[in-house]
């Protein structure tokens, strides 16, 4: 079952995204004093008077101009209206009625979707009524003055929105969502991949770098699992990013990585792994996210029977810190292997959430010690690994208790991680090993005993 939705529609720069943030009580929609900041339609959840619904932010609608992305933006607005339960037509009270407003109003009058006119930038309540009265001429009923910046009038507006929803529309069941972020440099095919996954033109696609300026959320049901898929803005080198739309979009993309259950890192099969790809991979590993590496544009590569193995070896040598990730080769354009992404992403999320009993962990460690003893230093002191336990998941984290962490070099630590993976799996997920010395362990035990004594005395 789906939530009712309202489509926010209007000319460029009338304050649609600011109003979206006000209605949703968030800062998720990018707000910047420049037309064309919002291009694709973006979704946010909101609630009012105990009723939950979705707010769909759209790009500035212009009918008389076909330059840049305006035709594609129109398509996105049309799709938003098509699926909406109600349209909120936002106009600028300070500018008054414009030819652009009249064109949009004519189009909305021909739509079957109910429309409410919100006259924005009415910061003064008394003046707002006067400013709003001019918009009766749009022929869409009573215009309502609001201030997206200060919030005045938005409560009354939300009451109208709730009353305007169809009474028989079901409210969405509470269901856990798996959040999957599509991450990558500009123009590697992230939006094409989103469209291929959804089976519709969910995002604007072009050869121009930076077409996607914000993170686009899409809900999709796949094999009894509900996925929230986020297409993020392409992330370039910091020195090439100017303050403005791209800056905010990239910050949003980084936040998406941090909040994701699983990241899909998209690599261009033609360009291979760049420095920026490595930095993105490092961010994913640093944040402890599950990951699937997707090599896009595979249809453009000339290949023989060994090409895929050679290319994978080369890519993995540069993405060595994601050695645990599954790598698949796809074509977003033709749809080749696109649906396999869900299978690998679900497996990665499952491994990311896994917990293993202490007894099983120690069986693996015992076997690992049998194959290869801890190193002995020149001083003659040898490392001793007493036992280990999993202390958390997402990502799976293990504490290993030893006599002295300094006696375990990087080579042996990698060996232990390899043995844990070999015996316990965790493909698609990072794992963290915390090495704790005897002194630290004894200190923790002593602290624990003191706490027990304090409790007993009380």
Curated annotation (Swiss-Prot):
Keywords: GTP-binding, Nucleotide-binding, Repeat, Ribosome biogenesis
Xref: InterPro entries: G_ENGA (IPR031166), GTP-bd (IPR006073), GTPase_Der (IPR016484), KH_dom-like (IPR032859), KH_dom-like_a/b (IPR015946), P-loop_NTPase (IPR027417), Small_GTP-bd (IPR005225)
GO terms assigned for molecular function: GTP binding; ribosome binding
Span of domain EngA-type G: 4-169, 178-353
Binding residues for GTP 1: 10-17, 57-61, 120-123
Alphabetical list of PROSITE patterns matching this protein: G_ENGA
Binding of GTP 2, residues: 184-191, 231-235, 296-299
Domain KH-like: 354-439
Any single GO BP term: ribosome biogenesis
Segment forming the signal sequence: none
Quaternary structure and interacting proteins, as annotated: Associates with the 50S ribosomal subunit.
Role summary: GTPase that plays an essential role in the late steps of ribosome biogenesis.
Family note: Belongs to the TRAFAC class TrmE-Era-EngA-EngB-Septin-like GTPase superfamily. EngA (Der) GTPase family.
HAMAP family: GTPase_Der
Protein name (record): GTPase Der
Organism: Prochlorococcus marinus subsp. pastoris (strain CCMP1986 / NIES-2087 / MED4)
């Amino acid at each position: 079952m789906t939530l009712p939705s309202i489509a926010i529609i209007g000319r460029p720069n009338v304050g649609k995204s600011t109003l979206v943030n006000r209605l949703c009580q968030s800062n998720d929609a990018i707000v910047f004093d420049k037309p064309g900041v919002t291009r694709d339609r973006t979704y946010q959840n909101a609630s009012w008077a105990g009723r939950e619904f979705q707010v769909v932010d759209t790009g500035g609608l212009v009918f008389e101009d076909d330059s840049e992305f305006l035709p594609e933006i129109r398509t996105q607005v049309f799709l938003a209206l098509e699926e909406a339960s109600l349209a909120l037509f936002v106009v600028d009270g300070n500018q008054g009625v414009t030819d652009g407003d009249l064109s949009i109003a004519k189009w909305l009058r021909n739509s079957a979707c109910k429309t409410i006119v919100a006259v924005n930038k009415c910061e003064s309540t008394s003046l707002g009524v006067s400013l709003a009265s001019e918009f009766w001429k749009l022929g869409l009923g009573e215009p309502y003055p609001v201030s997206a910046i200060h919030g005045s009038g938005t409560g009354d507006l939300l009451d109208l929105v709730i009353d305007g929803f169809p009474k028989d529309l079901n409210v969405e069941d509470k269901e856990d969502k798996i959040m999957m972020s599509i991450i990558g440099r500009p123009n590697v095919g992230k939006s094409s991949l989103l469209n291929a996954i959804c089976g519709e033109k969910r995002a604007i696609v072009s050869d121009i770098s930076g077409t996607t300026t914000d993170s686009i959320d899409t809900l999709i049901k796949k094999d009894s699992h509900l996925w929230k898929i986020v297409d993020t803005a392409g992330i370039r080198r910091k020195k090439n990013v100017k303050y403005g739309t791209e800056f905010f979009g990239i910050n949003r993309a980084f936040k998406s990585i941090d909040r994701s259950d699983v990241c899909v890192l998209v690599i261009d099969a033609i360009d291979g792994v760049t420095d920026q790809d490595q930095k993105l991979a490092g961010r994913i590993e640093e944040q402890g996210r599950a990951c699937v590496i997707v090599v896009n544009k595979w249809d453009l590569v000339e290949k023989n029977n060994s090409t895929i193995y050679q290319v994978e070896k080369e890519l993995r040598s540069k993405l060595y810190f994601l050695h645990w990730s599954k790598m698949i080769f796809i074509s977003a354009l033709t749809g080749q292997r696109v649906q396999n992404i869900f299978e690998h992403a679900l497996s990665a999320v499952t491994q990311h959430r896994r917990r293993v009993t202490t007894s099983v962990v120690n069986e693996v460690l015992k076997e690992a010690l049998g194959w290869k003893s801890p190193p002995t230093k020149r001083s003659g002191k040898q490392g001793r690994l007493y036992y280990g336990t999993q202390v958390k998941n997402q990502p799976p984290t293990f504490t290993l208790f030893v006599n002295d962490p300094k006696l375990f070099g990087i080579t042996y630590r990698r060996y232990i991680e390899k043995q844990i993976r070999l015996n316990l799996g965790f493909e698609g997920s990072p794992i963290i090993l915390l090495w704790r010395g005897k002194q630290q362990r004894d200190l923790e035990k002593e602290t624990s005993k003191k706490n027990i004594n304090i409790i007993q005395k009380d």
